[in-house]
A protein has these predicted regions:
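Solvent-exposed loop and capping/linker segments of extracellular ligand-binding repeat ectodomains
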Residues: 1-259
Length: 259
């Protein structure tokens, strides 16, 4: 592993070497790191308030980051475990995962208020197990775009995220994988919104599926303003349609064209 203060000049890093940082100072990491199991891994230790950024894959792929973790089981196991000082996560661009690659990665990161995007559409055994467990600062989960579950993939993923009140998924069945969502939403916010495809059976309400007092919404077409603006639907020619709009996905009002 190597570190740099400017992203240009690099020096070899020795595990357990503390790197002091004054406010505003940065340190970059790159290398060929990978954890290999629950007894063989490394974790960052932080004090103060630390914001991470950039591509996490440079820690394992060095100067040629890829989007695959194939063959790297447990690669980032517990990498930020217990980092209460962490206020922002790095980018996690991997689209090909490995077994338990992100297991317990952010466990107990109570200062984390926004989860990184998780773009992978195909899951591996235990890949996100306990990933955000006890991240009490999170209110929204990252979108989960995979349509098929894997054994233990989301097990206890958000367990103890007491502020979590929003989750959007793409999978259409709870079955076919062992304990894939076991206790994944245990001890989260008592009320919240669960967005899912219409095919997903949400009749069973518990911490391993959908919390009992959460609202279930269809994955409706949605526009989000990234800066101040507006949206309207303009009619051309002679068409008729009944359209409704909502700002929360729950309460709906009739819409008039060109409004």
């Amino acid at each position: 592993i190597q570190t740099s203060t400017d992203g240009t000049t690099w020096t070899n890093y020795t595990f357990d070497t503390n790197i002091p940082l004054a406010e505003g100072e940065k340190v970059y990491f790159k290398g060929n790191y990978k954890g290999t199991g629950v007894s063989d891994y490394a974790s960052f230790v932080m004090t103060g308030k630390i914001s991470a950024s950039g591509n996490l894959m440079t820690l394992t792929d060095g100067d040629s980051p890829t989007t695959t973790l194939a063959g790297k089981n447990y690669c980032f196991y517990k990498l930020f475990d217990g980092c209460t000082s962490l206020t922002a996560a790095p980018e996690l661009p991997a689209r090909t995962l490995s077994n338990y690659c992100y297991y317990s990665m952010f466990y107990g990161c109570t200062g984390l208020t926004q989860a990184p995007a998780l773009p992978a559409k195909t899951l591996s055994e235990g890949c996100y197990r306990d990933m955000f467990r006890a991240c009490t600062g999170l209110t929204e989960a990252p979108d989960l775009p995979a349509v098929t579950l894997a054994d233990y993939c989301y097990r206890q993923m958000f367990y103890g995220c007491t502020g979590l009140n929003y989750l959007r998924v793409k999978f259409t069945s709870w079955t076919g994988a062992t304990d894939a969502t076991l206790d994944w939403l245990a001890n989260v916010s008592a009320t919240g919104t669960f967005v899912c495809p219409t095919e997903l059976d949400t009749s069973t309400r518990n911490a391993s599926r959908v919390p009992s007092a959460w609202t279930v919404n269809i994955d409706y077409l949605c526009f989000t303003a990234v800066e101040t603006g507006s949206v309207k639907l303009t009619k051309k020619g002679n068409i008729t349609a009944t359209i409704q709009t909502s700002t929360d996905g729950t309460t709906w009002t009739n819409y008039t064209f060109d409004t």
